[in-house]
């Protein structure tokens, strides 16, 4: 294969379950030099009159050069080809909810944005997932007696933690009324017109970090507080606070939520809405087995993949598992008809997050989309993006 370029952009997406890869070599620039491209199982090699550039693939990715097919040149994009690939999908997940919470363990709740301790050294005796929204209907269908819990909310007892789709429910009765220091970094801000901060919880009360003023959650009752997974890190009290870039954390939490919900409920369409009940994004999960190369190193320089940058330090051997999604922004009254259609569809699942986090997620999606090769940015009327797991 030959092309003319002084510097070629490389895009590589490997599908683990399909054992296939899409390789795109950026469109040559005018005035470039001839270049021969060689594909080997563990590397890509580009030869020009000036020398040879070799891009090493991560150890978990191996290409099958003889399977190359579908070779075509796409104007404005570059050289496209597909080939077989072997990839190991093992990836180090950011520990956030189910993975980090263990019963009988003392945990500390941190504000993810600034690292402030929100709840210190809380021993969780029970860590339980909340049932799905249709659990009451299932009880009525399968039980021969009336449901004793019909229309009653589930509230955690002291030292309980209930896990929802995108939030934790924690009982803070003791901490609130006995003025324990574990809640001292958190202030209760009432959303009423007088805007006074009161200790007495109300249904419309936000929980805000005193240090960075980020909304962490809201009070559900006088004893129960909801913390959003995108705002809180829960660690064993024996471990220190992990420093994770905010965009990296947000997309990992959302990606893992999408994967778990799609697996548990066979739903692939999601409405991302704020705590103000406004819909910000419509998401459609395409697949969760993509492996995307983030950084490519050669002898002269390091080419960084802009696709998923935000970034932890990446090296030539790193690859990240990612979910591939279609999305539609819904801010400024966009896509109102589509929102109405999705709201009436029982197969669509809603995820509620702080409004500021919804905008953060939209920015992450837009940045991912803008850095994709132009031919991959749209599918039908939706935009395409990757969220790093």
Swiss-Prot record:
The keyword Glycoprotein does not apply. The modification N-acetylalanine is found at residue 2. Residues 353-389 are annotated as: HECT-like. Keywords: Acetylation, Cytoplasm, Metal-binding, Transferase, Ubl conjugation, Ubl conjugation pathway, Zinc. It is found in: Cytoplasm. GO terms for biological process: proteasome-mediated ubiquitin-dependent protein catabolic process; protein autoubiquitination; protein monoubiquitination; protein polyubiquitination. Pathway: Protein modification; protein ubiquitination. InterPro entries: UBQ-conj_enz_E2-bd_prot (IPR019193). One of its GO terms (molecular function) is ubiquitin conjugating enzyme binding. GO terms for cellular component: cytosol; nucleus; ubiquitin ligase complex. A motif (BRAT1-like motif) lies at residues 129-159. Residues 235-257 are annotated as: Interaction with UBE2C. Zn(2+) binds at residue 144. Its EC number is 2.3.2.26. The keyword Cytoplasm applies. It comes from the Eukaryota. It catalyses: S-ubiquitinyl-[E2 ubiquitin-conjugating enzyme]-L-cysteine + [acceptor protein]-L-lysine = [E2 ubiquitin-conjugating enzyme]-L-cysteine + N(6)-ubiquitinyl-[acceptor protein]-L-lysine. It holds the Pfam family HECT_2. The C-terminal half (AA 188-389) is able to bind cyclin-B and shows a self-ubiquitination activity (mono-, poly, or multi-ubiquitination) in a HECT-like sequence dependent manner. Interacts with UBE2C/UbcH10 (E2 ubiquitin-conjugating enzyme). In vitro, interacts with cyclin-B. PANTHER family: E3 UBIQUITIN-PROTEIN LIGASE E3D, E3 UBIQUITIN-PROTEIN LIGASE E3D FAMILY MEMBER. This is E3 ubiquitin-protein ligase E3D. It comes from Pongo abelii (Sumatran orangutan).
């Amino acid at each position: 294969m030959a092309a003319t370029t002084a510097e070629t952009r490389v895009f590589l997406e490997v599908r683990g379950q399909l054992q296939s890869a899409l390789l795109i070599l950026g469109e040559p620039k005018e005035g470039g030099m001839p270049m021969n491209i060689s594909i080997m199982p563990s590397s890509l090699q580009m030869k020009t009159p000036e020398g040879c550039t070799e891009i090493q693939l991560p150890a978990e990715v191996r290409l099958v050069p003889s399977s190359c097919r579908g070779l075509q040149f796409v104007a404005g994009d570059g050289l496209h080809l597909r080939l077989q690939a072997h990839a190991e999908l093992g990836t180090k997940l950011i520990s956030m909810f189910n993975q980090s919470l263990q019963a009988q363990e003392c945990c500390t709740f941190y504000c993810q944005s600034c690292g402030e301790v929100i709840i210190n050294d809380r021993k969780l005796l029970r860590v339980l997932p909340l049932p799905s929204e249709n659990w009451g209907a299932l009880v009525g269908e399968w039980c021969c007696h009336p449901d004793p819990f019909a229309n009653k909310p589930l509230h955690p007892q002291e030292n309980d933690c209930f896990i929802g789709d995108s939030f934790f429910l924690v009982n803070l009765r003791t901490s609130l009324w006995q003025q324990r220091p574990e809640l001292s970094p958190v202030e209760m801000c009432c959303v009423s017109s007088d805007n006074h901060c009161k200790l007495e919880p109300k249904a419309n009360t936000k929980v805000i970090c005193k240090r960075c003023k980020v909304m962490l959650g809201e009070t559900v009752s006088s004893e129960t507080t909801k913390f959003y997974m995108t705002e809180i890190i829960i660690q064993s009290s024996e471990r220190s606070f992990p420093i994770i870039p905010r965009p990296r954390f947000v997309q990992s939490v959302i990606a893992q939520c999408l994967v778990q919900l799609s697996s548990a409920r066979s739903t692939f369409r999601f409405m991302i809405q704020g705590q103000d009940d406004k819909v910000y994004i419509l998401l459609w999960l395409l697949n969760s087995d993509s492996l995307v190369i983030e950084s490519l190193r050669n002898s002269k320089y390091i080419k960084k993949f802009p696709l998923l940058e935000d970034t932890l330090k990446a090296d030539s051997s790193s690859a990240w598992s990612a979910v591939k999604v279609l999305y539609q922004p819904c801010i400024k009254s966009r896509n109102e008809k589509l929102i109405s259609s999705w709201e009436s569809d029982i197969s669509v699942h809603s995820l509620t997050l702080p409004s500021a986090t919804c905008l953060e997620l939209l920015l992450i999606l837009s940045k991912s989309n803008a850095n994709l090769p132009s031919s991959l940015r749209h599918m039908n009327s939706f935009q395409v993006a990757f969220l790093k797991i």
